[in-house]
Amino acid sequence: MSSDAFQIYRDFPFFMEEELEEIFQAHEKVVFQKGDFILKEGKTANEYYILEKGLARSFVNDFNGNEVTTHFFVENEIVIEVSSLFQRIPTQENIVCITDCEFRKMDFDTFQELYHKIQNLSEWGRAWMSQQLFVYKQRSVEIFTLSATKRYLHLLEQKPQVIQFAPLKQIASYLGVTDTSLSRIRKELVSHPKKN
């Protein structure tokens, strides 16, 4: 089975070809429309996804009821709410499609079965989780150590699809700024591109 979505497994050097094939076969192709929820607050996640095509985001509602984007998922990334899926608890987050999306999905029971059957999958899982921990830690530090402009440029460099397809309000909440501030940052970058 050939799909760029599975590159995340192929990049792990220890999988044998037959293990990869079994993992790939365990994924089901699913399609969601723009605005569809993959997971809603209060529900328990029962599957994880690999985003094959499109753009999705996770968000929480703050104490005032405002949506705050916690993550943007781009093509070939794993879309998961780790705490809910593995601890079997209701999530505080929502995951929604910003555009029409195509995914590869694996349910929790199938994942658990393969995780215990294929030793390399558990090794891959540990490596993936530690890498995600690093990414989230780095993001939490950058909120305090980088200017809003630098955070915007960083997002533009890492995930240009977000800038292209996500509404301004969602990007602003992810960066920790107001819509007005983000509009000003964008205007400054257009009129003075060399300053940053």
Predicted features by range, described:
Residues 64-67:
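Short alpha-helix-to-loop micro-motif enriched in aromatics/charged/Gly
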Residues 38-43:
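Short phosphate-coordinating micro-motif centered on Lys-Gly-acidic
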Residues 4-7, 132-141:
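Short, Lys/Arg-enriched N-terminal segment that forms or immediately precedes the first helix
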Residues 35, 46, 50-57, 75-76:
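Glycine- and acidic-residue-biased ligand/ion/polar-headgroup-sensing regions
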Residues 146-196:
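Phosphate-/nucleic-acid-contacting segments
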Residues 69-126:
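Cyclic-nucleotide recognition modules
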Residues 28, 37, 55-60, 78, ...:
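Short beta-strand segments in beta-sandwich/barrel cores
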Residues 1-28:
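Cyclic nucleotide-binding regulatory module and flanking cytosolic helices
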